[in-house]
Amino acid sequence: MAPQLAGSSHSSSASDQAHRQSSDPALESGSDTHVGSIAPKTETDFLVSFTGDDDPRSPKHMSSARKWLIVAIVSSTRLGLSPMILAPLSEFYGRKPVYVVSMFFFVVWIIPCAVARNIETLIVARFFNGFAGAAFLSVAGGTVGDLFPKNKLQAPMMVYTASPFLGPELGPVIGNFINSYLDWRWSFYILLIWAFAQWVSISLLVPETYHPVLLRREAQRLRKETGDDRYYAPIEKMDRSIAQTIIRSCYRPFLLLTLEPMCLLLCLFCSVLLGVLYLFFGAFSLVFKDNHGFNLWQVGLSFLGITVGMIIGISTNPFWHRNFMRLLQNHEAKTGTVGSSEPEFRLPPAVGGAPLVTIGLLWFAWTTYPSVHWIVPIIGSGIFGAGVIMIFSGVFTFLVDAYPLYAASALAANSFSRSMFAAAFPLFGQAMFRNLGYQWAGFLLAMITLLLAPFPYIFYRWGAKIRQHSRYAGAK
């Protein structure tokens, strides 16, 4: 948020009116000459800013219902390179233009997917379709931060975190039903209808929330109404170009992955988990078709186990929020500074979720026998799903707090690495399950997550010391 406007806040409508209706000729003419002991105005007096979270112009002042509606829309609309290019544009033009334009092209590129006559057309169309839709992976997190103060961020961030996982799990349920009774092209036709509805919702219901852009609009309004060109917003003083910002956005995530062990290892953990999630698209088809004779739509329903597990993981948020507030209060009592916090306080959900993903994968792996009832491996996948959502919630909020100046780059690094793993794992998933056997393939995945599971706790316990030696993270 920009610095608070000095004095009586010339950005308020009351002071604007007083300024315009003043009977002092010097004031009416825009002169800095004042009578009595009033000091001449400085440039800071014309800085347009919010007076706090309770400022009616601030997105944080919106009603809770409106905030959650915006979160629901931008979270349900949602791979690697696009966020690095599209996200910086929101720093210049705001969130909404990026949403509206990106979603429009997302809708447009679904059409050639639906009418494609060869695989080449489908691949090219899907590439541009994903490129357009990926803007929400990075920009939507910023919208959530625009709407909620820091101490109330965990619940909406949990919903935002869950959205890119609930989609892939509900997709096979809906898609397999469609493909069982209709032509495969109807999967894209229905997606086209849904995406168009989302685009309309974004265009009509989601306002601009990016604070610097809102303040720029306010400064423009004040200049127009008062005729005084000295009013300005901080964003209007930026000396960097769009090209410079995009270039920086493209290379800084790789610097974080290369030079920051915390960012690298947590992004690696998230990437493996998303890769396993996408690998299940092929593995579930093998396990439940071969072992239990499921047809296409029944295989789709088997993904509901992961969905239910994720919903259970989301429902644990009140517990983690209370834990965060307890850590915050203890830290305030220790330091004597009200509102002081540490990024590591965001990691307990990831610490709790790490053993769940390993347990869930082991459960799934060693219950994939024809003699074991089909519900048992599905329960294991649900445990895995609960752990995944808890880990991502903790890691996302930690990255934002640990790299305050480079939060967008940290999330872009996470998005890029996750997208690469999600694209690669399905390519070898079915071959691995066939060659190693269902049990040993699942066991291998569990052991990989076991190797990565200690890192959330390590960074929770010693992260502050590690940050002291970091060039990007905020040191303690």
Curated annotation (Swiss-Prot):
Any keyword Nucleotidyltransferase? no
Description of the deletion phenotype: Greatly diminishes the production of terreic acid.
Compartment(s): Cell membrane
Membrane-topology descriptor: Multi-pass membrane protein
From the UniProt entry, list the residue stretches annotated as the region Disordered.
1-38
Q: Which UniProt keywords apply?
A: Cell membrane, Membrane, Transmembrane, Transmembrane helix, Transport
What role is this protein assigned? Efflux pump that might be required for efficient secretion of terreic acid.
**Name of the molecule in the record:** Efflux pump atB
Taxonomically, what lineage is the organism?
Answer: Eukaryota, Fungi, Dikarya, Ascomycota, Pezizomycotina
Q: Which gene encodes it?
A: atB
